[in-house]
């Protein structure tokens, strides 16, 4: 009976639904503090979205304005989210370009964010500000503390001119962040049953409310202003609170829909509930009408219906349900309860013209999820039924802990051993799952950063993830079926398994969403260009990126992004052998980025060298050939010699420049590389003083740099064949794949064994990409590995000669041989998967032995590649052996 009475009037006042959530009567100042904090979080998330749209100045201005307003309020309540947002923005800017000034600023801002987070966490705990339905007061600022600590530690580690003491402090910060995130992650997993239960109740209950109270945990609208719970004196404050709730709802709605960055945003233009059962889903309430006429008798049922947020039930009728009388559950009260969660097998169904897996019991945490058919509106609506604070906690922990797990699992073994001693190590698969979940389910800065990480891992120029060891015909059906992951608020373990087995079918969906939301940022164009190149669509990638900068309406505001954009486009031109465009972009980079100016100029010179050779070989026809060759020779010599002058601590042009990571004068690996290459060239020129500089070059460094950026896996057939021919320019007469014969010799110097090893290695890589595995492996064995491996048989210890001419080559050749062996073995119809795994694992361990000869150029990159492959093969061993 009492439940029926409670359902009979329109709602205005807010009262607690459980004693545990009560703050003592109508304590409006306490409610206002909670809503003020939630609004601050939404503002911070919007500011960081501005950065993702290449409008960092607007985002920073928004934060500064809101911080100033907060200070002028003279409130004792902190606003710890603003320093974190500023720190995240500075961190992203710093790690895009490594400029010393930005690195220092990021360190300072993140240190302030750490202090502010700690202060805010203590404040929320002391004043019992219940901003979450399941987590204790202050939890959200434990997340901001962990996030700021992690990012600060990374900044400190990347600033290599720090002292040993500073580096030790950074490792301690990293360990502190790891421990905090590990604890928070376990708490989230333990709280998942409670979260799912509360979410289901919210979805049942909000359909009869005038306003969503999800951001005031433990409270709901009452239905009778005449009751003892609602006094006329509290009505103005109730209206004010409802105004705040509506504003927060609209802020979250526009952020989820991607309309929060427009200058004239109409948050009603996209209706996430258009597929719901009712014929008409009205917009959010118009509280101006309520304020102008606050009497409940003046609000007709029709007006109340129009003012309802989730109006699926008629206003003014009895609606009695035992479920609706349920109180929300506090996670602290129920963590010890045994709440069974069923997990039936997934239901596969056709939806929107494509295959997908549909989920029923939706969890924004999504560690394990039941399956049943559901509409897209069910999936989308969860974003609005989850409070801003809970969303931030879940996405923040999953992003940060995921990044930590992946990065720690990829670092070279020598460093990994040190880190394991101080108490933490990574789990690659667990970390990748966290990143995928965050990228799919979170429409905030955490989701987009998770997506950027995934794109770098899968489509970036460095192979962090080795997917080269695949067992044919062993893939499950789920890996071959592609389902939609856009606009999802949940993803199951079974779905994640399918996604991680076939990532190239899912990253494009997320990237399309990001490009739709952030139309101004060239960073997303860059990522799409990388993705197209990784799929072998080199011309399409170049057309996309060149077309973007050619359009006068497009502008890249952040010079760090412009530098990355130019560098990647330069490499794409290099893969396509568009030498003039490649050199042009590299020369431009000198004015855009100070990170490795010497490499930019050196590679511009190598581009002219390669065009020179292409003309000499008769592969490119030009007018005034002799004049063109002379001009190219001059440009090649000029830029190749100019490059070392920009190397920090070495050249005259670097005397007043702060190059290197963090702006110190420590030389980067590629700085050391080009100094070594130039030293070799100078030695050859001394031995052949009458030769022109361009004729003293052996195997062109052009092909080395292409390999370092994974170019042979991105070239189309014609460019792979052209690479093999160009590499033959310096080959010994009548040798394999050489352009020279005893009667027709293009090269003026003798090909040394060291230069021949380089040439054959790159030709082998091109042959493999052409599918000519046997030829490529034969070159690798006979002309590269046999030159330094002196003993390699099952009955004797592995022995090799330590060579120094090209330090990266020797471990890399063994690493690449394992991939040749795998491809050849698994292409046979009756292949032995166990023997293939064992043989490849043996080769990779030998590569690891050869690699462990101390620090050298590309040592970290080489070790990372070997480790990624070993991890993949070890996984196969555990599966098949």
Curated annotation (Swiss-Prot):
User: Which GO CC terms are listed, alphabetically?
Assistant: cytosol; mitochondrial outer membrane; nucleus
UniProt keyword annotation of ATP-binding present = no
Q: Which Pfam families match?
A: Iml2-TPR_39 (PF10300)
Arranged from A to Z, the UniProt key words for this protein are: Cytoplasm, Nucleus, Phosphoprotein
Q: What is its main location?
A: cytoplasm
The region called Disordered is annotated at 206-237
Per UniProt, subcellular location reads as: Cytoplasm; Nucleus
- What interactions and quaternary structure are annotated? Interacts with lipid droplet proteins.
Functional description taken from the UniProt entry: Inclusion body (IB) resident protein that interacts strongly with lipid droplet (LD) proteins. Involved in LD-mediated IB clearing after protein folding stress, probably by enabling access to the IBs of an LD-stored soluble sterol derivative that acts as a chaperone in inclusion clearing.
- Protein known as: Inclusion body clearance protein IML2
Species source reads Meyerozyma guilliermondii (strain ATCC 6260 / CBS 566 / DSM 6381 / JCM 1539 / NBRC 10279 / NRRL Y-324)
């Amino acid at each position: 009976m009492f439940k029926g009475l409670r359902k009979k009037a329109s709602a205005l006042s807010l009262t607690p639904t459980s004693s545990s959530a009560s703050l003592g009567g109508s304590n409006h100042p306490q409610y206002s503090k909670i809503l003020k904090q939630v609004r601050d979080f939404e503002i911070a998330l919007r500011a960081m979205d501005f950065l993702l749209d290449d409008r960092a100045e607007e985002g920073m201005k928004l934060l500064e304005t809101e911080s100033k307003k907060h200070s002028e309020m003279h409130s004792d309540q902190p606003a710890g989210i603003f320093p974190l947002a500023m720190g995240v923005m500075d961190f992203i800017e710093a790690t895009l370009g490594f400029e010393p000034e930005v690195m220092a600023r990021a360190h300072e801002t993140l240190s302030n964010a750490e202090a502010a987070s700690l202060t805010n966490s203590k404040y929320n705990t002391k004043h019992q500000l219940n901003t979450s339905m399941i987590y204790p007061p202050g939890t959200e600022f434990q997340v901001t503390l962990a996030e700021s600590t992690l990012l600060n530690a990374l900044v400190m580690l990347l600033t290599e001119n720090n002292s040993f003491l500073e580096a030790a402090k950074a490792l301690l910060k990293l360990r502190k962040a790891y421990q905090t995130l590990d604890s928070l992650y376990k708490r989230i997993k333990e709280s998942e049953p409670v979260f799912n239960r509360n979410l289901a109740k919210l979805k049942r209950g909000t359909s009869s409310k005038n306003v969503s109270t999800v951001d005031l945990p433990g409270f709901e609208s009452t239905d009778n202003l005449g009751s003892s719970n609602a006094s006329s004196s509290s009505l103005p404050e109730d209206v004010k609170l409802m105004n705040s709730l509506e504003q927060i709802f609209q802020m979250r709605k526009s952020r989820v829909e991607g309309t929060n960055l427009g200058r004239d945003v109409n948050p009603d233009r996209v209706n996430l509930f258009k597929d719901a059962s009712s014929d008409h889903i009205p917009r959010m309430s118009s509280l101006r009408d309520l304020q102008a006429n606050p009497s409940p008798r003046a609000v007709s049922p029709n007006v109340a219906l129009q003012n309802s947020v989730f109006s699926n039930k008629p206003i003014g009728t009895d609606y009695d349900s035992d479920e609706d009388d349920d109180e929300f559950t506090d996670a602290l009260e129920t963590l010890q309860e045994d709440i069974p969660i069923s997990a039936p097998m997934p239901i596969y169904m056709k939806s929107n013209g494509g295959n997908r897996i549909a989920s029923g019991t939706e969890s924004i945490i999504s560690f394990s999820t039941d399956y049943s058919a559901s509409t897209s509106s069910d999936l989308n609506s969860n974003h609005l039924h989850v409070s801003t604070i809970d969303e931030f906690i879940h996405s923040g922990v999953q992003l940060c802990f995921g990044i930590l797990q992946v990065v720690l699992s990829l670092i070279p073994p020598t460093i990994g051993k040190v880190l394991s001693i101080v108490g933490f190590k990574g789990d690659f698969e667990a970390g990748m799952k966290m990143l995928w979940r965050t990228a799919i389910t979170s429409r905030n800065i955490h989701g987009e950063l998770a997506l950027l990480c995934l794109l770098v891992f899968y489509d970036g120029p460095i192979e962090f993830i080795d997917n080269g060891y695949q067992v044919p015909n062993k893939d499950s059906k789920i890996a071959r079926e592609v389902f939609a992951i856009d606009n999802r608020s949940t993803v199951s373990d079974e779905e994640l398994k399918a996604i991680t087995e076939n990532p190239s079918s899912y990253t494009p969906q997320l990237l399309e969403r990001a490009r739709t939301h952030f139309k101004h940022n060239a960073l997303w164009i860059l990522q799409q260009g990388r993705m197209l190149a990784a799929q072998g669509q080199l011309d399409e990638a170049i057309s996309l990126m060149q077309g973007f900068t050619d359009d006068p309406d497009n502008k890249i505001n952040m010079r760090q992004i412009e530098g990355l954009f130019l560098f990647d486009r330069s490499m794409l031109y290099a893969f396509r052998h568009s030498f003039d465009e490649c050199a042009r972009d590299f020369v431009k980079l000198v004015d855009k980025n100070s990170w490795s100016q010497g490499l930019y100029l050196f590679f511009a010179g190598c581009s002219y060298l390669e065009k020179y050779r292409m003309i000499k070989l008769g592969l490119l026809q030009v007018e005034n050939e002799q004049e063109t060759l002379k001009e190219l020779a001059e440009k090649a010599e000029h830029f190749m010699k100019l490059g070392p002058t920009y190397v920090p601590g070495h050249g005259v042009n670097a005397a007043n420049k702060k190059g290197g990571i963090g702006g110190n004068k420590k030389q980067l690996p590629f700085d050391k590389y080009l100094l070594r290459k130039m030293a070799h060239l100078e030695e050859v020129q001394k031995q052949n003083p009458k030769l022109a500089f361009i004729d003293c070059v052996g195997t062109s460094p052009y092909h080395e740099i292409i390999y370092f950026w994974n170019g042979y896996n991105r070239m189309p057939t014609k460019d792979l064949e052209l690479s093999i021919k160009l590499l033959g320019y310096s080959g010994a007469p009548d040798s394999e794949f050489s352009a020279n014969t005893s009667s027709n010799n293009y090269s003026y110097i003798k090909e040394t064994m060291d230069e021949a090893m380089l040439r054959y290695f790159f030709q082998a890589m091109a042959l493999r990409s052409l599918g000519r595995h046997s030829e490529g492996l034969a070159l690798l064995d006979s002309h590269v590995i046999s030159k330094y491996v002196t003993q390699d048989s099952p009955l004797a210890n592995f022995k090799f000669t330590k060579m120094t001419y090209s330090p990266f080559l020797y471990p890399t050749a063994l690493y690449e041989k394992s991939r040749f062996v795998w491809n050849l073995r698994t292409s046979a119809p009756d292949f032995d998967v166990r023997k293939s795994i064992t043989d490849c694992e043996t080769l990779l361990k030998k590569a690891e032995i050869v690699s462990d000869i101390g620090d050298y150029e590309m040592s970290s990159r080489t070790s990372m590649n070997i480790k990624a492959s070993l991890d993949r093969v070890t996984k196969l061993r555990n599966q098949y052996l």
